[in-house]
Swiss-Prot record:
Function comment: Catalyzes the oxidation of 5,10-methylenetetrahydrofolate to 5,10-methenyltetrahydrofolate and then the hydrolysis of 5,10-methenyltetrahydrofolate to 10-formyltetrahydrofolate.
Pfam family, one: THF_DHG_CYH_C
PANTHER family: C-1-TETRAHYDROFOLATE SYNTHASE, CYTOPLASMIC, C-1-TETRAHYDROFOLATE SYNTHASE, CYTOPLASMIC-RELATED
Biological process, per Gene Ontology: L-histidine biosynthetic process; methionine biosynthetic process; purine nucleotide biosynthetic process; tetrahydrofolate interconversion
Name recorded for this polypeptide: Bifunctional protein FolD
GO cellular-component term (any): cytosol
HAMAP family with a match to the protein in the record: THF_DHG_CYH
């Protein structure tokens, strides 16, 4: 039976350390990190995520602000607001909650954020730094997973890692971070031939395909470490992952649950990156 990777407990531990670091810097400089989150429209899931981010920022001792904009906000208005925060040195992190309404171009919005304040790590400049082996801002979910590996003593060097899912938010940066730790990485997706066979060779399996219970025990090697990034709802509205937890946990050595696994770590890493952006602003 697999040991559970408790993302909630680890996130709380790291959040406590972050609050201590923030308090020390405030004592020394009289300043605190500032994080602004921009929410356009009334997407219920987005409202929950934004509330969690605000709560986490306040718990870390940050200044936190949420800009709630109506659904009909134009792209020009949104870009203008972002530029206001780009130019304001009191704010060190800018997060725009995705998805945005259909009439707004996500890419144009992400490009508009100052790369130094892009704590999501989605700006092409930050992606390029990650690919070139000089990461500054890293997408928070992969960063959280790497923190889990560190905490639970998961050896990466020389290991075979398979990532299922090729998004810019999780799959691609995850593969890059694993490569940087000298794992041998295979990046796969829904159209990969013989996907189960490929996955079954993995010592470390990261699943971010966005399909409920997609990965069964047929995908998993005995003793593998399994990270489930999925957030799906079943027919009863229950939150489930991309991994069939009950059967995979019988053969994995370590596994993340859904909920309580990767999700809490993502928010904590956003806070950590806001703190680091604040520190860099003090040094510049």
């Amino acid at each position: 039976m697999a040991e559970l990777i408790d993302g909630k407990a680890l996130a709380a531990k790291l959040q406590g350390k972050l609050a201590q670091k923030t308090a020390k810097l405030k004592e020394k400089t009289g300043q605190t990190p500032g994080l602004v989150v921009v929410l356009v429209g009334n997407n219920p899931a987005s409202q929950i995520y934004v509330r969690n981010k605000e709560r986490s920022a306040l718990a870390a001792g940050f200044r936190s602000k949420v800009e709630r904009l109506p659904e009909e906000t134009s792209q020009e208005e949104l870009l203008s607001l972002i530029e206001t925060y780009n130019q304001n040195p009191d704010w060190h992190g800018i997060l725009v909650q995705l998805p945005l309404p259909d009439h707004i171009d996500d890419e144009a919005v992400l490009l508009a954020i100052d790369p130094d304040k892009d704590v999501d790590g989605f700006h092409p400049l930050n992606m390029g730094k990650l690919w070139s082996g000089h990461p500054v801002m890293i997408p928070a979910t992969p960063a959280g997973i790497m923190a889990m590996f560190h905490e639970y003593g998961v050896e990466l060097e020389g290991k075979r890692a398979v990532v299922i899912g090729r998004s810019n938010i999780v799959g691609k940066p995850m593969a890059q971070l694993l490569l940087a730790k000298n794992a041998t990485v295979t990046l796969t997706h829904s159209r990969t031939h013989n996907l189960a066979k490929t996955a079954k060779r993995a010592d470390i399996l990261v699943v971010a395909i966005g399909r409920g219970h997609f990965v069964t025990k047929d995908f998993v090697k005995e003793g593998a470490v399994v990270i489930d990034v999925g957030m799906n709802r079943d027919e009863n509205g229950k939150l489930i992952g991309d991994v069939q937890f009950d059967e995979v946990s019988e053969i994995a050595s370590l596994i993340t649950p859904v909920p309580g696994g990767v999700g809490p770590m993502t928010i904590t890493m956003l806070m950590e990156q806001t703190y680091q952006a604040f520190k860099r602003s003090l040094e510049s």
